[in-house]
Amino acid sequence: MKGKIIKGIAGFYYVHAVDVGNTMGTVYECKAKGVFRKDHRKPLVGDDVEMDVLDEAQKKGNIRELLPRHSELIRPAVANVDQALVIFAITKPQPNFNLLDRFLIMMQQQDIPCIICFNKQDIDEEGKKEDYRAIYEQAGFRTITVSAAKKEGIDTIQELLRGKTTTVAGPSGVGKSSLVNCLQSGTVMETGSISEKIERGKHTTRHSELISIAQDTYILDTPGFSSLGLFRLEKEQLAEFYPEFAPFEKYCRFGGCSHIS
């Protein structure tokens, strides 16, 4: 049976398998075969796998094969991500553009397309949303504005996520959890015990987890956003990640200038 790893805790992997006649699927608690350790291969959240069901009633299984990956992120450690959705608030709190740019660069370094989502458009009293959208669309990023509180723009996000695995990130206070709740509204997996199984991991550091929100559509809630750091990058390389600045380079009379003053 084929499935996708949605969470890993303490050597257990939770595999989401879509059954015939059950589009929301079933989650099985699985162990990975020792051959993966021997081959120095570690299953990751997001991996597509072949599994054997050991106990259908208890939803237990074994992962016997890791299927080829089309992408692999290092931060967070996850496989087969198609795109990233980064969420900031238009206001309350004010967006930290330095943090946003760092995330965009980090995803570009790993060849992952990014969608920028500005939440809380319902309280945008200063009319900033069009300014923010223009800045990042000029840089080549798909940028949308929504309101989780008013459920405005949710259909747009759902359409952008359809049929893909998307890592979702954002600092605290921007309404990321509210948006995730809107996206997964009405999606219930067959097994009612998955939440109980995953409770075992409460004593551990928070893990990344894939959430199935529609058929073949997953979102990954990304922890640790505020402590983002870039991979090693020389300042001369930063220009590659700011294409919107390229048209102005010819006006600088200093060769090799970093344009920092």
What are these regions (language model features)?
Residues D122-V174:
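Canonical P-loop GTPase G-domain recognition
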Residues K176-G192:
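A conserved segment at the C-terminal end of the G1
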Residues M1-A10:
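Structural detector for short beta-strands of small beta-barrel domains
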